[in-house]
Design a protein with these regions (language model features):
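A conserved beta-strand-loop-helix scaffold within acyl/acetyltransferase catalytic domains
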Residues: 1-32, 57, 62-79, 91-105, ...
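Conserved catalytic-core motifs of GNAT/GCN5-like acyltransferases
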Residues: 80-86
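Conserved acetyl-CoA-binding loop-helix of GNAT-fold acetyltransferases
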Residues: 39-50
Length: 192
C-alpha cells in the first residue's frame, strides 16, 4: 500500500508512523498507524494531531481497526460504518455438497464459455499490462467512474509489476484476459 505512491508517511520519532493524505481541509489517516506498542497509541495520536494542526488540517481516520476506536473516542471522535471487509478461511471453502452448488455452477459455466483462471507471477504481469490497462479503463468508463486512488487504488504500471495478478482469460485463440485483480499478500501468506 505504501508503494502505491498516493499516500504520504508521517513519522513520530521512534513511536511509529502512519499513511495519510490531505484532502480538502482534512488530513486523512488510512488504516491503523504502526506503533511499537499499544501503550504508545495515545502519544502517537497526540503527535499526529499536532502535525495536522501545523498543516492547518483537521485529522480524520479511514479504515482503522477496532483496536483504535477507544483511543479515538476519548478524543471526541464519532464513528460510522463505511463499506465492508470480509475474511474468508480458504480451508473452509468447499465445492462439495449444497454449500458449493453455486460455485460449481459458476465454474461449469466458465468452462463452457471457454474461460480459465490463473495467477500470473510478477515477472509475467508486464507482458499483460496493455490488456490490463484497457480492461481497467473500460470498466471505469462502463461504471462512469474515475480512479479511486486513496482507499481502493488505481491502475499504475509500476505497482502492478510488483505483485502477482489473478486473471480470467479466454482459452480460445487468441488468448485474451477478460478480467483481473492484483494480489497483495499479507503476513505469512495468510491474507490476500
Amino acid at each position: 500500500i505504501v508503494g502505491a505512491g498516493d499516500k504520504a508517511l508521517s513519522f513520530d520519532g521512534q513511536r511509529g508512523f502512519c499513511l495519510y493524505r490531505t484532502i480538502g481541509p482534512y488530513l486523512v489517516v488510512f488504516s491503523d498507524p504502526v506503533v511499537r506498542s499499544l501503550a504508545e497509541r495515545s502519544a502517537f495520536l497526540d503527535a499526529l494531531f499536532a502535525f495536522a494542526g501545523q498543516l492547518d488540517r483537521r485529522p480524520a481516520v479511514y479504515q482503522m481497526s477496532l483496536d483504535w476506536i477507544p483511543v479515538l473516542h476519548d478524543r471526541g471522535y464519532d464513528f460510522f460504518k463505511l463499506g465492508e471487509e470480509a475474511h474468508v478461511k480458504l480451508a473452509n471453502v468447499t465445492l462439495e455438497g449444497h454449500a458449493g452448488k453455486m460455485y460449481r455452477q459458476i465454474l461449469r459455466r466458465a468452462e463452457r464459455d471457454g474461460l480459465r483462471f490463473r495467477i500470473l507471477p510478477p515477472n509475467d504481469v508486464a507482458d499483460q499490462l496493455p490488456q490490463l490497462r484497457e480492461i481497467s479503463a473500460d470498466w471505469l468508463q462502463a461504471k462512469e467512474l474515475a480512479e479511486r486512488q486513496f482507499s481502493i487504488g488505481y491502475f499504475d504500471d509500476d505497482y502492478m509489476r510488483r505483485y502477482p495478478c489473478a486473471v480470467v482469460e479466454s482459452t480460445s485463440a487468441p488468448c485474451r484476459v477478460m478480467g483481473f485483480a492484483n494480489l497483495l499478500e499479507g503476513p505469512d501468506r495468510q491474507e490476500l
